[in-house]
């Protein structure tokens, strides 16, 4: 069997509603941007294949709803994620303050050694910026996780954010892991459905 990729990484985008998670995903996966804001309902995902260090890596990127009412649905997607990108809005202090809460969610639901990346989005809105780059960088450094400011609107650092995440995961997994597009990675999303029981509303 000759698979079309060497690695399959599942990434998760989390953060408050309205910080631009869907826009980041659209920019990275389709290189498009839209001003019209529609809240993600539950979970959406896109796939993009990248080349890194001579290897083909398939990124399965899950975009989660930020609203509290979807928290129980989205929490099941933490399981099996190789990397989680926590997004806040640089023009919204509350979304930055809530990063700690999102990191607690990761500790609660994700695997222990999952890779994390902190992203401050909407960096193009310089006049409205309230979260200082240095503050966020120091916070990320204290946790030992990478940090980037991005703009889905003008594409600043969007590519770099996802590539950084992929490189970190690849480094952690080492040369032998997840190669050959092994099937065990693909059954992750079929298991969390059962415990929920009688529907989600």
From Swiss-Prot:
Pfam family name, one: Ras
Gene3D superfamilies hit by this protein: P-loop containing nucleotide triphosphate hydrolases
Residues holding GTP: 17-23, 33-36, 39-40, 66, 121-122, 124, 151-153
Name of the protein in its database record: Ras-related protein Rab-1B
Modes of activity regulation: Regulated by guanine nucleotide exchange factors (GEFs) which promote the exchange of bound GDP for free GTP. Regulated by GTPase activating proteins (GAPs) including TBC1D20 which increases the GTP hydrolysis activity. Inhibited by GDP dissociation inhibitors (GDIs).
Ranges for region Switch 2 region: 64-83
Compartments it resides in: Cytoplasm; Membrane; Preautophagosomal structure membrane; Cytoplasm, Perinuclear region
Further information: Rab-1B binds GTP and GDP and possesses low intrinsic GTPase activity.
Cofactor(s) the protein needs: Mg(2+)
Binding site for Mg(2+): 22, 40, 63
Organism: Homo sapiens (Human)
Lipidated positions per record (S-geranylgeranyl cysteine): 200-201
Family designation: Belongs to the small GTPase superfamily. Rab family.
Cellular-component GO terms for this entry: cytosol; endomembrane system; endoplasmic reticulum membrane; endoplasmic reticulum-Golgi intermediate compartment membrane; extracellular exosome; Golgi apparatus; Golgi membrane; perinuclear region of cytoplasm
Keyword Lipoprotein annotated: yes
Entry keywords, A to Z: Acetylation, Autophagy, Cytoplasm, Glycoprotein, GTP-binding, Hydrolase, Lipoprotein, Membrane, Methylation, Nucleotide-binding, Phosphoprotein, Prenylation, Protein transport, Transport
Region (Disordered): 174-201
Family matches, as CDD domains: Rab1_Ypt1 (cd01869)
(Microbial infection) O-AMP-tyrosine PTM sites in chain numbering: 77
Modified residues ((Microbial infection) O-(2-cholinephosphoryl)serine): 76
């Amino acid at each position: 069997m000759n698979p079309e990729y060497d690695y399959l990484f599942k990434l998760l985008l989390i953060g408050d509603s309205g910080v631009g998670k869907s826009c980041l995903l659209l920019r990275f996966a389709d290189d498009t941007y839209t001003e019209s804001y529609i809240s993600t309902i539950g979970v959406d995902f896109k796939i993009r294949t990248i080349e890194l260090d001579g290897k083909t890596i398939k990124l399965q990127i899950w975009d989660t709803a930020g609203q509290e009412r979807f928290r129980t649905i989205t929490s099941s997607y933490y399981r099996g994620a190789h990397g989680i990108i926590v997004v806040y809005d640089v023009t919204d202090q509350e979304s930055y303050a809530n990063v700690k809460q999102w990191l607690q969610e990761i500790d609660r639901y994700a695997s222990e050694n999952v890779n994390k990346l902190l992203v401050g989005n909407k960096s193009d809105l310089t006049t409205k910026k309230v979260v200082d780059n240095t503050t966020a960088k120091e916070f990320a450094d204290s946790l030992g996780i990478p940090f980037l400011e991005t703009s889905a609107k003008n594409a600043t650092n969007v590519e770099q954010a996802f590539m950084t995440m992929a490189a970190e995961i690849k480094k952690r997994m080492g040369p032998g892991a997840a190669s050959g597009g092994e099937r065990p990675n693909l059954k992750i999303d079929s298991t969390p459905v059962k415990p929920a029981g009688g529907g989600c509303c």
